[in-house]
Structure formats: C-alpha cells, structure tokens
Amino acid sequence: MCVYKTYKGKLKITSIPARADRPRLPFPLNFLIHKRKLYLIDTIAEVQRCADCGSYFKQTHTCSTRRRDFYFHHINTQSSDWWEEIKFFPLGAHPDTRRLFVVYDVETYTWHGSFGKQLMPFMLVFTLFGDAQLCEQAVNIAKKQKWSSWPKQANTFYYLNPQRNKVGSLFKQYRDALQEAASTLLWRQFLADNPCLENLCLKLGYVHASDIPFEELCTLELKGQPTFLEVYVVGHNINGFDEIVLAAQVINNKQGIPAAFKVSRNFMPRCGKILFNDLTFALPNPTHAARKDFKDWEEGTPTSADYKFQFVKFMVRDTFALTHTSLRNAAAAYALPVEKGCCPYKAVNEFYMLGTYRTDADSFPQRDYWSSDEEYLLNKSLWLQENSGAYDIVQRTLDYCAMDVLVTAELVKKLQASYLDFVHTSVGLPHCNFNVLQRPTISSNSHAIFRQVVYRSQRPNRSSLGNFLLAPSNEMYDYVRESIRGGRCYPTYIGVLTEAIYVYDICGMYASALTHPFPAGKPLNPFDRALAIKNWQDRLTQLHRPIDYFDRTLLPAIFTIDADPPPEAFLDVIPPFCSRKGGRLCWTNETLRGEVVTCLDAITLHNRGWRVQILNDPRTTVFPQWECLARDYVQLNIAAKERADKEKNQTLRSIAKLLSNALYGSFATKLDNRVTVFSDQMEDKYVRGISDGTYDIKSTAFVETDNLSSSVMAELKITYSPVKQQTDATRKHRQCTPTSNSSSDEDAPFYTLGDPQNHHVTYTYKPITFLEADDSALCLHTLQKKSSLIFNNRYPSHIASFVLAWTRAFVSEWADILYLEDRGTPLEDRILKFVYGDTDSMFLTQRGKELMDTRGKHRLKGNNRPLVFDPTNPQLTWLVECETQCPRCHGDAHSQESVFLAPKLYALKNIYCPSCRAESSGKLRAKGHATSQLSYDLLVTCYYSTEQLGDEKFGTSRLSLRRSLVSRQTHQQPFTVTETTLARTLRPWKDRTLRAIDRHRLAPYSNSHPNPRNKELCWMEMY
C-alpha cells in the first residue's frame, strides 16, 4: 500500500509494507492525501512535462501560443523576471501646484586647504519669484535673517563675507527656514481639514497632533483636498560647482520637521556632479484612489486622486542640465531681455587672497585679467562713461553676480513658458500642465515626452506602457547591454597629408535612426523563438543573396553569433562591426566568436560577405513585430524645428534640437546596483538589506569638517590651585565648627595667585569646534547589492542597441559607396579615399569626394531628400553634407594640408574653396588638451620630431576643477572642489587599435594580422 501526499507543490510517497498475518489484496491499494482529504487512487500512469508551457501529458500534447507565452514570462523561474513593464505617470504636473523659485549664484576665491587649492564662497546673491504667498514668506525670512537687499531689483538679496563658512552657514539657515515655513503651511492646512487629530493625539498618548507618526496617519479616515508645494533652488551649473561648495552647509535637512511627515531624499552623485538632490516632506492624500479610466493620462493630465501623498518638495535644479550651454550662450539662444556681464575673476581672486590686484594707469584691472582685448576695452569704456569714481572691485563683482542671477531667473521663466508651449502645440497636449523643472535633465524630459507619446498612441489602459514596450531586467539586462556597441573614432592615416581633405557629416544621425523600425511587443517563447531563428539562419546561409533590412518575414531579434569574414581582398578599412574581445573596443575584420548582436548587425555582416552562424543561447530574444516607435516623437521635433526656422524663433529651435538629440541617450542609460545615502537618511529597505546580506557597504566617507557650519570656542586657559590634601584631624575640626551656610568659604577657600613658577598649575585648552550637524549627517555610505543582476523597469535598453545598429547600417552603405569598386584588390594597393572617421563623419580625399558626387549623390543633403523614414516606402534613410564649406559662396571646400596624430587629435591647416578661391581658418581638435596652446604648426612639429626620434617633449596644461562628491581615495575629500593643473603629453598615437600598412597608412586587424590584445579563448567542438 502506498500513500501519496502533496506538500508545497511536491509529491511525497510513503510505502506501507504488507503484514504477513493478513491476506494480500488482488489489486494495489493507493491513497492520495490532498487538502486534508483522502482519495482512493484508481490508476497511476507516468506523464511527461512540456518544456514550453509546463503542462503534463501522457503521450501527445498540443499547447497554445498564449499558454507558452504565459509560462515563459510568468512561471518559468529562469525567464519570468527577464522583462519588466515600464512604469508610466502622466507628463504634466498637478494644475494646482504652488511653486517658489530661489535662483542663486556664488562667487568664490581660492583657499589653500589641507586637500589642495579649494574654492571658498565669499558672496551669494539670490532672487525670489513664484507663488505670491510663498514668495512673501521667503522675503520675510530673508529680511529677518538680515540679508542685504540689492537695490536694483526687488526680492533680490545678497550676503558678502570673505570668512570661511560664513556664506554657506547663512544660506543653510535660510534654506532650513524655508523648509520649516513650507512644511508648517502644509501642516496647518492639513490640520484645518482634519480637526479631529487634536483630540485623537491625546487618546493615542501624543502631546501634539504633529507627533502622530506618518504610518498612523495613513490608517485614519482623513478629509480635505491635497496641497502640493514645490520649492526650486535653481542656478546655472550649480550641480557641478555651487551645490558642491555649499553642500556641507546644507546637508542637515530634517531640522524642525514634525514626525507626522514622511521625509525622503533622492540623492544621486554621478560623474562628479549632483544629478539628484530632492527632498520630499509628505502627508497622506485623503482623495487618493486607484484609477480605472485612463483617458486623462492619455492627455498627460494627472488629477488629485492619482497622488498617494500631498507634499512639500525641495528640489535643486541646474539650468545647464536643461540647456547644455553656457549662461552667455543661453541668453542669446533663448532671446532673453538681459545679458550676462563680464568679471575679472583672477583680479577678484588675488584681491581676496593677497589684498590687492594689478591695475593699469587708470586704476582699472590690467588686460591679462580679462579673457580678450575686446572684453577689456568694452568694460573699461563702460566704467569710464559712468564716471563713478575709483574702481570698486567688490561692488563690481556684486553687480556682476546679481546680473548672473537675473539672467538665470529670466532663463528659468523662458524655459518654463517655452517648453509648456512646445508640449501644447508641437506635442499636441493642450491640457497638459508641463513643468520642465519637474525633471532634472533634458534627457529625463525627452524620455518622459517619448513615453507620453507612446502611451497616447497605444492606449494600454493601465499604469504602464503595457506589453508594447518592455524593459530588459536581471540576466536579460546584461545580455542586451552586451549588444550595445559604441561609436567609431580612429584615423587610417598618421602624419602630414598634403592632399585635399573634405569632411562629410551625417545629418542628425541619431534622429534619422530613431525614425526607423524597432522591436515591439512581448518576446516570443522558446518554441516560437526557435522557429523564427530557423528562418533567420536559413536566410543567412544563402551567402550570395543579400537580405533586405525591411523584410517583414524576418522578426526583430538579439542573438549570439559566430561570423567569418570573406577573403581579405574583399575587406575594407571601414569594418561592419566592432568587438571588445581584446579589452578595448576595436573595429576589426577578424573572425568574430560569441558576439551578441542585433539582427540588423547580422544583415550588415551578411551583405558585406561575412558567413554568419547563430549560436544556441537560452537568452536569445525574438520580438513579434517591427514598429516605428520613435518616429512620431522625432517628426514633431523636426516639424517644430522647421517652424522655428520659418518664424525665426531661436528658442523653439533650441528646444526641438535638444529634445531630438537627447532621446537616444535616455535609452542608453546604464544602471548599476550602487546607491549613495547619508547615514541619517537611510531608508528601511537599505537597513534591512544590510542586515540580511542583500546589500554591502562598499565604502564610507565623511564630509570635510573644515567646510561645515560650526561655532568655535576660543583658546581657554584655566589656573588650578595645587593645595595639598587636608589631614583627617583638620577635616574633623572643621566639621565640628558651626557654620551658618554649607556653602561657606571654608568649603572652597579663595585661592590667591602666588608665584607663577611654584604655586599654581595652568592648563591651556585648545579651541573647541562645535559642529551644527550630527555625526550621522556627515557620513555617506555607498551601498551595493551583492547580486550582480540589475533590476530595470525604466529604460528599454534594447532600443539603444537597435539605434546603434541602424547607424552601423548607414556607415556600411557609405563604405559600399566608397569601396565597392575596390573589392578584390588588396588593402595595400588601394587608392587613399578615407583618412579619419568619427561616429557620424568621414574625412575624404579628392577621390572620395568624387565618389560621393557620383555613386553617393542620392545621399547628399538637398533637393527635399527625406531625413525621416517612410514606412510606406521602406529603405535606409540618411543624408550627409559637406561640413567644410566656403563661408563666402557656401560651396564645398577642402583643407589643402592636414595632420593626424591620434583619435580626436588632428588639425586642418585651412579651408580653401576652389570655386571662389576664398581661404578661411582651419579646424583643430585635441580632446583633453588646452587647444588655446596648440596650433597646426605645433602638431606638425610634434609629428616630425617623434618620427625623427627627437628629444623634444610636447604638451599642454590647463587649470581644472576637480569635483569630489563621494570618493574612496584618501587624498580626495567628499563635497570639495579643488583647483588642479592638468598636464597632457602631446604625441602621435602609441597604443593603436589598427595595424600599420606603411609609415602612414593604417588598416583594421584581420585574420592574417590579428589583434595582439585578444587573448580570449573560445570553446569549439569539432565533428
């Protein structure tokens, strides 16, 4: 007899042996215990399990596509977490949100501290605008704290103090007071709507209603309409400078906030800048409810019920992250009514360091303090016209700083109004209350607009983009990231070239690529995936039959391949693919093994004569359909750009260009498992993660205490009496003596100072610094998940991979234009046509230009040729234009002589037009170098000196600001900005990623000339 018992999805079998004293039954007796019930089993049969849908069957089985998909995406333990739905929230903000803007700027001088030359603020100016009530409160706080009013503009204040920490300390007090005032305003409104809290707090054992914990408030039945307050601290380039310099003074952000608020902070340092530094003080929203009708969301308009909390938000925003240009250029690009002034920074720095600065005969700062003769003469003439007496450098610096603040304030207003108009008219969301400052960067704004456009077109009727567009996660995230290949940048010629060089550039390469089809929908299950891969392999096996990029019978896919190149005489100096197998990204003609590619790359390789074999990989992904996901988004930007050109609206043109270029970058955002938190603001999930081993503390750093707000007790001297211990008899005698007061002089005899050499002891206490922050507020932890897998529900990273694959298809077609006639001729015997290439540009010789004018004529910009992919007439859509144009006749021009030393290190001597014989200055690029110290002749001299084995050393140096936010290096302190001298050596390319054909020409690695860095072994099975 057997007893079967089910437990947690498993079957446990217990055999009960037959007893000898009882007769045997003629049939087996089997029981099943399931859910506390006993069943008698009639028959038992062996079954099989379907690997595709998880069903059990005896002999034959037919599973549906729907069941296979569900099992693959939701049940299978290996693949169920590979793809996540992308969360969505409407683009706009709540229409009743009240906002206050604090726009500020600081001026600094150099201070030599323990960690090098640090920049210390001595002046801060800010201006206020926004909601009338909030603005009035902010002005009153400024006056109460004795900020000085700038007489030339209302609601503008400043503070001037060269002593260290004074400026930051006062600004900290002001921001703390703003936080307290705004949170108090929200709490009073919340309490007015819920007066029952006053009585409830006493029943719960609290003194004040504000002492009721946030978690307790969430369980109560609350009333009233939510209040949304936002305070923006804004500046230009403050995330890379001002906020770091002042951060030590403003890190204590919970001061004076009642326990009823839920306080959360989003702090993210990246690349030496503060990407996010947002604080939220939240209370429950009584009107919150789950949404059932999503029509409002399609229009980008959230309602009060969509917000789980009502809040006060404090956000730091950098206008540089929204404009990607200097304040002076932004003022011109956005047609602001005010202009940025000029300031002799070095003179100001010397004045505060040395107490003086050098002047000319008119007591005006000398010429070398100004950036150019023009700037020097203009500012001097303006000063002389004012006839305001002696030059007051402090007052001039104050006026300059205040004007910067006013320019930034006007820029903020212009950005808000212009982006709102863009969303209403160009995007077609007239009811959307869009606030560009709600998100910190142009990339995050472009991605939000893209998601809104997709949501409107697809109508998923849920709080995500649905299955139409998913995000790769965990194992699949790493697999997709392997298929993302960077750009191309290398010279195929080293040295001085006396031939004519034309520079051609792809027009809006990423924008054009984004209009092409991309994968959409939920990836196929393994069974259907195998059928699709079989179809791909059958087509790739037909070597002499080109594959159309837009063949709809071939589904979009990402897979692992091996690829073998054609004979070397049929290869080009522009390979179709690149590899990281050697440790560095290298464009190579070598055999490819185990490369993760998109199906577009497989087509590109196949059409260039490569033999492609798809490998069996469980992570292989096939999507059900092609869709032009971003075409509408790019089209509306192009339409806005054309409208701006017609209306001569520079602001609209700048917005459209920025949004168009930023979308690809948002797709390619790389996530990691690290997070930086302050010790006193560590959320519960991180505390639990550290305790259960999910997170590790990778590093801990402390903010430099020299920069902190503090109070100092000066040096203190105390003299102590060296009186010897009294005898017991003396003590007894004094105890018997009547006293009128227990605190008489007998208990503590007055000490009279005697001989300082013999009769006293003096202790000298060093100055004591009392910091205005707890130790936990100074400590930063960098936490990292122990698991290397990355959860992603934000970015469809595979779209970035396909964008780059489309650009490689563009360049491959460009290579066919240049080198189709040379196929079959060894590389060493070919005519020089191409000498340098960036991701979207090529430097061509005269022969290369002739081919572009003949075979590539259809790819030249002009004659209304399209830049946007047309789904009704599918073909690769890209155009190029000659960048070296004559400034006089606007015809194609060339450089008569050029020098190429290394990637991103070259110079064109001049730009000469053969039509009108006009000549203009050339072009010099030297990444990492101070280009003001370089010239064409210097690069030529450097090349010849190196070739002739000369001893002369060439280099450049420049002052650089080293920003440290969170550092694991002992010589770098968190939240400091130090000034360093960056020296770079100037020399020809040493560590090349190409092989040499002769003294000048280079070619990609191939099987006959393999990459010496590639030490990776590949497992191959021979049959």
Swiss-Prot record:
<keyword id="KW-0548">Nucleotidyltransferase</keyword>
<dbReference type="GO" id="GO:0003677">
    <property type="term" value="F:DNA binding"/>
</dbReference>
<dbReference type="InterPro" id="IPR006172">
    <property type="entry name" value="DNA-dir_DNA_pol_B"/>
</dbReference>
<dbReference type="GO" id="GO:0042025">
    <property type="term" value="C:host cell nucleus"/>
</dbReference>
<dbReference type="GO" id="GO:0039693">
    <property type="term" value="P:viral DNA genome replication"/>
</dbReference>
<keyword id="KW-0235">DNA replication</keyword>
<feature type="region of interest" description="Disordered">
    <location>
        <begin position="726"/>
        <end position="751"/>
    </location>
</feature>
<keyword id="KW-1048">Host nucleus</keyword>
<dbReference type="GO" id="GO:0003887">
    <property type="term" value="F:DNA-directed DNA polymerase activity"/>
</dbReference>
<dbReference type="InterPro" id="IPR012337">
    <property type="entry name" value="RNaseH-like_sf"/>
</dbReference>
<keyword id="KW-0238">DNA-binding</keyword>
<protein>
    <recommendedName>
        <fullName>DNA polymerase</fullName>
        <ecNumber>2.7.7.7</ecNumber>
    </recommendedName>
</protein>
<dbReference type="InterPro" id="IPR023211">
    <property type="entry name" value="DNA_pol_palm_dom_sf"/>
</dbReference>
<dbReference type="Pfam" id="PF03175">
    <property type="entry name" value="DNA_pol_B_2"/>
</dbReference>
<dbReference type="InterPro" id="IPR004868">
    <property type="entry name" value="DNA-dir_DNA_pol_B_mt/vir"/>
</dbReference>
<dbReference type="GO" id="GO:0006261">
    <property type="term" value="P:DNA-templated DNA replication"/>
</dbReference>
<comment type="subunit">
    <text>Heterodimer with the terminal protein; this heterodimer binds to bp 9 to 18 of the genome. Forms a complex with viral pTP, DBP and hosts NFIA and POU2F1/OCT1 for initiation of replication.</text>
</comment>
<dbReference type="GO" id="GO:0008408">
    <property type="term" value="F:3'-5' exonuclease activity"/>
</dbReference>
<comment type="function">
    <text>Eukaryotic-type DNA polymerase involved in viral genomic replication. DNA synthesis is protein primed, and acts in a strand displacement replication. Assembles in complex with viral pTP, DBP, host NFIA and host POU2F1/OCT1 on viral origin of replication. The polymerase covalently transfers dCMP onto pTP, thereby initiating complementary strand synthesis.</text>
</comment>
<dbReference type="InterPro" id="IPR017964">
    <property type="entry name" value="DNA-dir_DNA_pol_B_CS"/>
</dbReference>
<dbReference type="InterPro" id="IPR043502">
    <property type="entry name" value="DNA/RNA_pol_sf"/>
</dbReference>
<dbReference type="GO" id="GO:0000166">
    <property type="term" value="F:nucleotide binding"/>
</dbReference>
<comment type="similarity">
    <text>Belongs to the DNA polymerase type-B family.</text>
</comment>
<keyword id="KW-1194">Viral DNA replication</keyword>
<dbReference type="InterPro" id="IPR014382">
    <property type="entry name" value="DNA-dir_DNA_pol_B_adenovir"/>
</dbReference>
<keyword id="KW-0239">DNA-directed DNA polymerase</keyword>
<keyword id="KW-0808">Transferase</keyword>
